[in-house]
Amino acid sequence: MRRGLERTKGALVCAILIAAARFVRAAEPPDPVSVFVPAPVLPDPEVRKNSLLLSGAVLLAVLIVGELTWWRSETTEKFHMKNEGWLGQETYAGGADKVSHLVGGYIVSRELAIGFERIGNSPARSRALATGLTSLAGVLVEAGDGFSVYGFAWEDAVANLAGASLASAITAAKADDLVGLRYGLVHAKIPPPDGRAAAYGSDYSREIYSLDLKLAGLFRRLNADAGPARFLVFSANYGSKGYRFSPAERRERNVGFDVGLNMVEILSAVGVRESTWWGLPLLKFFTYYRLEFTAWGWRYDLNHGRWSGFGTGNRFDPGKVSYR
Protein backbone atom coordinates (compact mmCIF):
# COMPACT_ATOMS: atom_id res chain seq x y z
CA MET A 1 0.00 0.00 0.00
CA ARG A 2 1.41 3.37 -0.94
CA ARG A 3 0.39 6.84 -1.89
CA GLY A 4 -0.53 6.34 -5.53
CA LEU A 5 -0.22 9.93 -6.74
CA GLU A 6 3.24 10.35 -5.21
CA ARG A 7 4.41 7.02 -6.59
CA THR A 8 3.20 7.63 -10.13
CA LYS A 9 4.60 11.16 -10.15
CA GLY A 10 7.89 9.62 -9.13
CA ALA A 11 7.68 7.17 -12.03
CA LEU A 12 7.05 10.01 -14.48
CA VAL A 13 10.00 12.01 -13.13
CA CYS A 14 12.17 8.90 -13.26
CA ALA A 15 11.19 8.33 -16.89
CA ILE A 16 12.14 11.86 -17.87
CA LEU A 17 15.48 11.71 -16.03
CA ILE A 18 16.42 8.31 -17.43
CA ALA A 19 15.50 9.55 -20.90
CA ALA A 20 18.58 11.77 -20.78
CA ALA A 21 20.61 8.60 -21.33
CA ARG A 22 19.53 8.72 -24.96
CA PHE A 23 22.06 11.45 -25.53
CA VAL A 24 24.84 9.05 -24.52
CA ARG A 25 26.34 7.29 -27.51
CA ALA A 26 26.76 3.55 -27.02
CA ALA A 27 27.20 0.35 -28.97
CA GLU A 28 24.12 -1.67 -29.90
CA PRO A 29 24.85 -5.42 -30.06
CA PRO A 30 22.47 -7.75 -31.95
CA ASP A 31 19.12 -8.37 -30.28
CA PRO A 32 18.23 -12.01 -29.55
CA VAL A 33 14.68 -13.17 -30.13
CA SER A 34 13.93 -13.88 -26.48
CA VAL A 35 12.51 -11.16 -24.26
CA PHE A 36 14.57 -11.97 -21.19
CA VAL A 37 17.48 -14.27 -22.21
CA PRO A 38 20.72 -12.24 -22.32
CA ALA A 39 22.86 -12.04 -25.43
CA PRO A 40 25.36 -14.93 -25.67
CA VAL A 41 28.40 -12.63 -25.41
CA LEU A 42 28.99 -10.96 -22.08
CA PRO A 43 29.37 -7.16 -22.11
CA ASP A 44 32.82 -5.73 -21.61
CA PRO A 45 33.99 -4.73 -18.10
CA GLU A 46 33.18 -1.05 -18.63
CA VAL A 47 29.59 -1.85 -19.57
CA ARG A 48 29.22 -4.17 -16.57
CA LYS A 49 30.64 -1.50 -14.27
CA ASN A 50 28.29 1.16 -15.61
CA SER A 51 25.35 -1.22 -15.33
CA LEU A 52 26.20 -1.87 -11.68
CA LEU A 53 26.55 1.85 -11.03
CA LEU A 54 23.15 2.56 -12.60
CA SER A 55 21.53 -0.27 -10.65
CA GLY A 56 23.12 0.83 -7.39
CA ALA A 57 22.09 4.44 -7.95
CA VAL A 58 18.47 3.42 -8.56
CA LEU A 59 18.28 1.20 -5.48
CA LEU A 60 19.98 3.83 -3.30
CA ALA A 61 17.54 6.46 -4.56
CA VAL A 62 14.61 4.18 -3.69
CA LEU A 63 15.86 3.77 -0.13
CA ILE A 64 16.58 7.48 0.37
CA VAL A 65 13.26 8.64 -1.07
CA GLY A 66 11.37 5.99 0.89
CA GLU A 67 12.99 7.02 4.16
CA LEU A 68 12.60 10.76 3.64
CA THR A 69 9.08 10.58 2.21
CA TRP A 70 7.29 7.80 4.08
CA TRP A 71 9.01 5.45 6.47
CA ARG A 72 10.64 7.66 9.09
CA SER A 73 7.28 9.13 10.15
CA GLU A 74 5.25 5.93 9.84
CA THR A 75 7.32 3.20 11.48
CA THR A 76 5.87 0.50 13.73
CA GLU A 77 7.52 -1.82 16.22
CA LYS A 78 7.95 -4.87 13.97
CA PHE A 79 7.73 -6.09 10.40
CA HIS A 80 4.27 -7.21 9.32
CA MET A 81 2.50 -8.40 6.19
CA LYS A 82 -0.81 -7.15 4.81
CA ASN A 83 -3.06 -9.01 2.38
CA GLU A 84 -4.73 -6.28 0.31
CA GLY A 85 -6.36 -8.33 -2.45
CA TRP A 86 -6.57 -7.23 -6.07
CA LEU A 87 -9.41 -5.38 -7.81
CA GLY A 88 -12.35 -6.46 -5.67
CA GLN A 89 -15.03 -4.16 -4.32
CA GLU A 90 -13.82 -4.48 -0.73
CA THR A 91 -10.10 -4.15 -1.46
CA TYR A 92 -7.92 -1.15 -0.66
CA ALA A 93 -8.86 1.73 -3.01
CA GLY A 94 -10.99 -0.65 -5.05
CA GLY A 95 -7.88 -2.02 -6.72
CA ALA A 96 -6.68 1.33 -8.08
CA ASP A 97 -3.52 0.97 -6.00
CA LYS A 98 -2.66 -2.27 -7.80
CA VAL A 99 -3.19 -0.71 -11.23
CA SER A 100 -1.02 2.19 -10.09
CA HIS A 101 1.79 -0.24 -9.26
CA LEU A 102 1.34 -1.93 -12.65
CA VAL A 103 1.61 1.34 -14.57
CA GLY A 104 4.49 2.60 -12.43
CA GLY A 105 6.41 -0.64 -13.00
CA TYR A 106 5.80 -0.35 -16.73
CA ILE A 107 7.06 3.24 -16.94
CA VAL A 108 10.20 2.73 -14.86
CA SER A 109 11.15 -0.57 -16.52
CA ARG A 110 10.71 0.81 -20.04
CA GLU A 111 12.95 3.79 -19.36
CA LEU A 112 15.54 1.78 -17.44
CA ALA A 113 15.82 -0.57 -20.41
CA ILE A 114 16.64 2.43 -22.60
CA GLY A 115 19.23 3.57 -20.08
CA PHE A 116 20.89 0.15 -19.88
CA GLU A 117 21.01 -0.11 -23.66
CA ARG A 118 22.57 3.33 -24.03
CA ILE A 119 25.48 2.35 -21.80
CA GLY A 120 26.29 -0.62 -24.03
CA ASN A 121 24.08 -3.58 -23.11
CA SER A 122 22.24 -5.52 -25.79
CA PRO A 123 18.52 -4.75 -26.11
CA ALA A 124 17.55 -8.14 -24.67
CA ARG A 125 19.95 -7.84 -21.73
CA SER A 126 18.76 -4.28 -21.13
CA ARG A 127 15.17 -5.45 -20.85
CA ALA A 128 16.16 -8.26 -18.49
CA LEU A 129 18.16 -5.90 -16.28
CA ALA A 130 15.36 -3.32 -16.27
CA THR A 131 12.72 -5.89 -15.38
CA GLY A 132 14.80 -7.30 -12.55
CA LEU A 133 15.85 -3.92 -11.18
CA THR A 134 12.32 -2.50 -11.28
CA SER A 135 10.97 -5.58 -9.50
CA LEU A 136 13.72 -5.49 -6.87
CA ALA A 137 13.08 -1.79 -6.25
CA GLY A 138 9.40 -2.60 -5.74
CA VAL A 139 10.26 -5.31 -3.21
CA LEU A 140 12.50 -2.86 -1.33
CA VAL A 141 9.65 -0.36 -1.12
CA GLU A 142 7.34 -3.06 0.21
CA ALA A 143 9.99 -4.20 2.70
CA GLY A 144 10.14 -0.66 4.04
CA ASP A 145 6.35 -0.57 4.17
CA GLY A 146 6.51 -3.75 6.25
CA PHE A 147 7.91 -1.67 9.12
CA SER A 148 5.30 1.08 8.67
CA VAL A 149 1.56 1.34 9.12
CA TYR A 150 1.11 0.08 5.55
CA GLY A 151 2.62 -3.38 5.87
CA PHE A 152 4.31 -5.51 3.21
CA ALA A 153 1.77 -6.22 0.45
CA TRP A 154 2.94 -9.01 -1.84
CA GLU A 155 0.25 -8.04 -4.34
CA ASP A 156 2.01 -4.71 -4.86
CA ALA A 157 5.30 -6.47 -5.60
CA VAL A 158 3.58 -8.77 -8.10
CA ALA A 159 1.90 -5.80 -9.78
CA ASN A 160 5.29 -4.08 -10.12
CA LEU A 161 6.74 -7.23 -11.69
CA ALA A 162 3.77 -7.53 -14.05
CA GLY A 163 4.17 -3.94 -15.22
CA ALA A 164 7.92 -4.32 -15.73
CA SER A 165 7.44 -7.59 -17.63
CA LEU A 166 4.74 -6.04 -19.80
CA ALA A 167 7.08 -3.20 -20.75
CA SER A 168 9.77 -5.71 -21.74
CA ALA A 169 7.36 -7.82 -23.77
CA ILE A 170 5.96 -4.83 -25.68
CA THR A 171 9.42 -3.48 -26.45
CA ALA A 172 10.70 -6.91 -27.51
CA ALA A 173 7.76 -7.19 -29.91
CA LYS A 174 8.65 -3.72 -31.27
CA ALA A 175 5.11 -2.64 -30.45
CA ASP A 176 5.77 0.52 -28.44
CA ASP A 177 4.26 2.58 -31.24
CA LEU A 178 1.13 0.40 -31.12
CA VAL A 179 0.26 -0.10 -27.45
CA GLY A 180 1.23 1.50 -24.15
CA LEU A 181 0.14 2.38 -20.62
CA ARG A 182 -0.52 5.86 -19.28
CA TYR A 183 -1.48 7.60 -16.06
CA GLY A 184 -3.72 10.66 -15.82
CA LEU A 185 -5.63 12.98 -13.53
CA VAL A 186 -9.28 13.97 -13.78
CA HIS A 187 -11.31 16.48 -11.83
CA ALA A 188 -13.43 14.98 -9.08
CA LYS A 189 -15.40 16.46 -6.21
CA ILE A 190 -13.26 15.64 -3.19
CA PRO A 191 -14.14 17.15 0.19
CA PRO A 192 -11.53 19.02 2.26
CA PRO A 193 -9.33 16.71 4.34
CA ASP A 194 -10.85 17.56 7.73
CA GLY A 195 -10.23 14.74 10.19
CA ARG A 196 -7.84 13.03 7.83
CA ALA A 197 -4.77 13.15 10.03
CA ALA A 198 -5.57 9.95 11.92
CA ALA A 199 -5.90 7.87 8.74
CA TYR A 200 -3.48 6.84 6.05
CA GLY A 201 -3.41 5.75 2.43
CA SER A 202 -4.24 7.41 -0.85
CA ASP A 203 -7.41 8.71 -2.38
CA TYR A 204 -7.51 7.65 -6.02
CA SER A 205 -10.66 9.52 -7.04
CA ARG A 206 -8.71 11.89 -9.29
CA GLU A 207 -6.56 9.21 -10.93
CA ILE A 208 -7.14 7.19 -14.09
CA TYR A 209 -4.98 4.53 -15.76
CA SER A 210 -5.28 3.57 -19.41
CA LEU A 211 -4.16 0.89 -21.85
CA ASP A 212 -3.88 2.52 -25.27
CA LEU A 213 -4.15 1.29 -28.84
CA LYS A 214 -2.37 3.88 -30.98
CA LEU A 215 -3.94 4.19 -34.41
CA ALA A 216 -0.74 5.57 -35.94
CA GLY A 217 1.04 2.30 -35.17
CA LEU A 218 -1.95 0.20 -36.23
CA PHE A 219 -2.26 1.82 -39.66
CA ARG A 220 1.51 1.62 -40.09
CA ARG A 221 1.33 -2.14 -39.69
CA LEU A 222 -1.57 -2.32 -42.12
CA ASN A 223 0.45 -0.33 -44.68
CA ALA A 224 -2.47 2.08 -44.89
CA ASP A 225 -2.73 5.85 -44.77
CA ALA A 226 -4.13 6.78 -41.36
CA GLY A 227 -4.80 10.38 -42.30
CA PRO A 228 -6.00 12.42 -39.31
CA ALA A 229 -6.77 9.14 -37.47
CA ARG A 230 -3.06 8.86 -36.66
CA PHE A 231 -3.61 11.48 -33.99
CA LEU A 232 -6.10 9.25 -32.10
CA VAL A 233 -5.88 6.45 -29.55
CA PHE A 234 -8.47 3.96 -28.37
CA SER A 235 -8.16 3.35 -24.63
CA ALA A 236 -9.41 0.96 -21.99
CA ASN A 237 -9.05 2.47 -18.53
CA TYR A 238 -9.61 1.85 -14.84
CA GLY A 239 -10.19 4.06 -11.83
CA SER A 240 -11.91 4.07 -8.46
CA LYS A 241 -13.71 6.85 -6.62
CA GLY A 242 -14.65 7.56 -3.02
CA TYR A 243 -12.75 4.77 -1.30
CA ARG A 244 -10.92 7.22 0.93
CA PHE A 245 -13.92 9.11 2.27
CA SER A 246 -17.34 8.06 0.89
CA PRO A 247 -19.82 5.58 2.38
CA ALA A 248 -19.70 2.12 0.80
CA GLU A 249 -22.82 2.66 -1.29
CA ARG A 250 -21.19 5.66 -3.02
CA ARG A 251 -17.86 4.11 -3.94
CA GLU A 252 -17.14 3.24 -7.56
CA ARG A 253 -14.82 1.00 -9.57
CA ASN A 254 -14.99 2.15 -13.17
CA VAL A 255 -13.86 0.37 -16.32
CA GLY A 256 -13.89 2.81 -19.23
CA PHE A 257 -13.51 2.95 -22.99
CA ASP A 258 -12.32 6.20 -24.58
CA VAL A 259 -11.27 7.82 -27.80
CA GLY A 260 -8.51 10.36 -27.23
CA LEU A 261 -5.69 12.38 -28.72
CA ASN A 262 -2.22 10.97 -29.24
CA MET A 263 -0.25 13.96 -27.96
CA VAL A 264 3.11 12.45 -28.91
CA GLU A 265 1.97 12.06 -32.52
CA ILE A 266 0.60 15.60 -32.55
CA LEU A 267 3.79 17.09 -31.10
CA SER A 268 5.91 15.13 -33.57
CA ALA A 269 3.77 16.40 -36.44
CA VAL A 270 4.41 20.02 -35.46
CA GLY A 271 8.16 19.51 -35.30
CA VAL A 272 8.99 18.45 -31.73
CA ARG A 273 11.97 16.07 -31.88
CA GLU A 274 13.65 13.75 -29.38
CA SER A 275 17.01 15.02 -30.58
CA THR A 276 16.55 18.32 -28.73
CA TRP A 277 17.11 18.84 -25.00
CA TRP A 278 13.55 20.13 -24.53
CA GLY A 279 11.78 17.89 -27.03
CA LEU A 280 12.82 14.61 -25.43
CA PRO A 281 11.37 15.27 -21.93
CA LEU A 282 8.24 16.79 -23.46
CA LEU A 283 7.60 13.73 -25.62
CA LYS A 284 8.43 11.43 -22.71
CA PHE A 285 5.95 13.22 -20.48
CA PHE A 286 3.10 12.76 -22.91
CA THR A 287 4.12 9.19 -23.65
CA TYR A 288 3.11 8.31 -20.10
CA TYR A 289 0.71 11.07 -19.06
CA ARG A 290 -2.91 11.26 -20.14
CA LEU A 291 -3.93 14.92 -20.34
CA GLU A 292 -7.44 15.61 -19.06
CA PHE A 293 -10.08 16.58 -21.64
CA THR A 294 -8.06 14.94 -24.43
CA ALA A 295 -9.98 11.64 -24.07
CA TRP A 296 -13.74 11.08 -23.91
CA GLY A 297 -15.84 7.97 -23.58
CA TRP A 298 -18.03 5.80 -21.40
CA ARG A 299 -17.47 4.07 -18.06
CA TYR A 300 -19.05 1.03 -16.43
CA ASP A 301 -19.29 1.10 -12.62
CA LEU A 302 -18.57 -2.44 -11.42
CA ASN A 303 -19.93 -1.69 -7.94
CA HIS A 304 -23.37 -0.63 -9.14
CA GLY A 305 -23.64 -2.29 -12.55
CA ARG A 306 -24.34 0.87 -14.52
CA TRP A 307 -22.89 2.89 -17.40
CA SER A 308 -22.04 6.59 -17.38
CA GLY A 309 -20.78 9.00 -20.05
CA PHE A 310 -20.12 10.50 -22.54
CA GLY A 311 -17.37 12.16 -20.46
CA THR A 312 -13.79 12.24 -19.17
CA GLY A 313 -14.33 10.20 -15.99
CA ASN A 314 -14.70 13.19 -13.68
CA ARG A 315 -18.31 12.64 -12.61
CA PHE A 316 -18.75 11.54 -9.02
CA ASP A 317 -21.03 12.36 -6.10
CA PRO A 318 -19.12 11.60 -2.87
CA GLY A 319 -22.25 11.65 -0.70
CA LYS A 320 -21.87 12.10 3.05
CA VAL A 321 -18.19 12.36 3.86
CA SER A 322 -16.55 10.28 6.55
CA TYR A 323 -12.76 10.10 6.35
CA ARG A 324 -11.32 6.75 7.37
Model-identified regions with their sequence ranges:
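Bacterial N-terminal signal peptides that target proteins for export
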Residues: 2-12
